[in-house]
Amino acid sequence: TGNFGQSLSSQQDITPLVLDRAQVTLILIGLAMLLALAGAIPVGMWLALRNRSRGADVVSAGTQLGIAVPSFLLGIILVAIFAVHLGWLPANGWVPPNQGAGEFIRHLILPVIALAVVQGAMLTRYVRSAVLDVLHQDYIRTARALGQSPWEALKRHGLRNAALPVLTVAGVQLTTMVVGAVVI
């Protein structure tokens, strides 16, 4: 019915309070997912094209570390470094966009990065796996036999096919980001 009842502390309806905070959560999740995808797609493609190289192994280890660290712990570490120690960014709070774009962005940087790193690390692994699958397809082998480089064959013939499983996983990850955004 959409009625969450009344707050025990303020005796106000909870529904408008939840809706006010939902806007903030959706902005945070949207920006974090965009940042996660913007980092995961090129890094995952690079990992697949450089599979089993020393550099790819180091980056893969970094993605495993990114997956292992919970977003709330990363958020605490980022606040300790960039807000408390260096004083570059605010430690908490929310500034609506109508109160100045600069302050709005400054207050979003740390939570967006904390959410995006964990999700981006997971998406990077999925992108790598999807691109590796595509690179072993017959149409990529044919393109390579016709003289295209691995990157060119992937760009022209394989990216659309590799994107399908990644976008599916990204959609599922949006739900986990809601939990992370609430905690952060």
What is the predicted role of each segment?
Residues 1-16, 89:
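Short membrane-interfacial helix/loop motifs at transmembrane-helix boundaries
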Residues 6-10, 97, 115:
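Pocket-edge positions in alpha/beta enzyme catalytic cores
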Residues 8-10, 93, 131-133:
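Short, well-ordered turn and helix-capping elements at secondary-structure junctions
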Residues 16-56, 71, 88, 98-184:
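Alpha-helical transmembrane segments of integral membrane proteins
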Residues 58-62:
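Membrane-interface segments at loop-to-transmembrane junctions
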Residues 64-77, 173-174:
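Hydrophobic alpha-helical membrane-insertion segments
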Residues 71-98:
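Extracellular/periplasmic helix-loop junction at the C-terminal end of a transmembrane helix
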